[in-house]
Regions:
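N-terminal secretory signal peptides that target proteins for export/translocation
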Residues: 1-7
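Bacterial N-terminal signal peptides
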Residues: 9-22
Length: 260
């Protein structure tokens, strides 16, 4: 490990490494703590409901051009395989709207917030250090996210998303996603508007994380598409390895064994 000796004293001080504090190894770096003046969103969370605040159902509204694009893509194939069966992560915004009992772990620090979704092990990094979206970023399913605090709510802007031509949430490189994430209590969301789709009758505790999601794309959607996802805290739960692709590999291995 590198020592911290001044050059002028290397010959003497570094010989006495156990006696001179200046020569002791530098302490290992530690992660920056979450800023004390903002709510800590850290923890394991499970989505239990998604709603459309417009009350018009959860299916997105596409533009005529968007409908044509999706139909044209699907018409090329006799059948479009189910993405989950092939361990193919659907990316944003679907990863924040999944209510299929796979948790999301949030780790918050002062400079960034990391979300790890157990489903297909999709990872989001939300940068909180004031940086802008880069010019040389390779588009990907979860995009590139930057966040700013608005009081107790974290506002996330996601861009640089890769193209996705499957319903219900297609994307182009022009797709933009804005989120407003904050903590509340279950009692504060008891008045549920039309379009609320719950997967459990009642969350297991009163701690609720709310993610207000707005998806825009000038070619795909008929205006901004808004959804609100509700997550319950899973205090005694840990995210696990999502070893989906291992099954396909083992199946291929067995086929090779049988062909010998």
């Amino acid at each position: 490990m590198r020592t911290t000796c001044p050059l002028s004293s290397v010959a003497v001080a570094c010989v006495a490494v156990l006696l001179v504090p200046a020569c002791t190894p530098a302490p290992p770096p530690t992660a920056a703590p979450a800023a004390a003046d903002h709510p800590d969103l850290s923890g394991v969370w499970m989505a239990f409901a998604v709603e459309n605040p417009d009350g018009t159902g959860n299916a997105p509204r596409y533009s005529p051009e968007g409908e044509a694009t999706l139909d044209e893509f699907a018409a090329q194939f006799s059948e479009v395989p189910e993405t989950g069966a092939w361990c193919y992560g659907t990316g944003m915004p679907s990863v924040m709207m999944s209510t299929v009992s796979y948790p999301i772990e949030i780790v918050q620090h002062a400079s960034r917030l990391v979300m790890v979704a157990e489903l297909e092990m999709q990872v989001r990094r939300v940068y909180l250090d004031g940086r802008a979206h880069p010019d040389d970023f390779l588009p990907q399913g979860v995009g590139h996210s930057v966040g700013t605090w608005d009081g107790d709510a974290l506002v996330i802007d996601t861009a640089l998303l890769s193209e996705w031509q499957l319903r219900p949430w297609p994307r182009t490189e022009q797709t933009r996603i804005t989120e407003r994430v904050y903590l509340t209590k279950l009692a504060n969301i008891s008045a549920r508007p039309t379009g609320f789709v719950a997967t459990v009758e009642k969350p297991i505790n009163d701690d609720v994380l709310v993610d207000e999601i707005t998806v825009t794309d000038p070619t795909l959607y008929a205006g901004p598409q808004r959804r609100t996802a509700y997550f319950q805290r899973m205090a005694d739960t840990a995210t696990l390895e999502y070893a989906c692709s291992a099954e396909h590999w083992l199946e291929a291995l067995e086929k090779n064994r049988a062909s010998q």
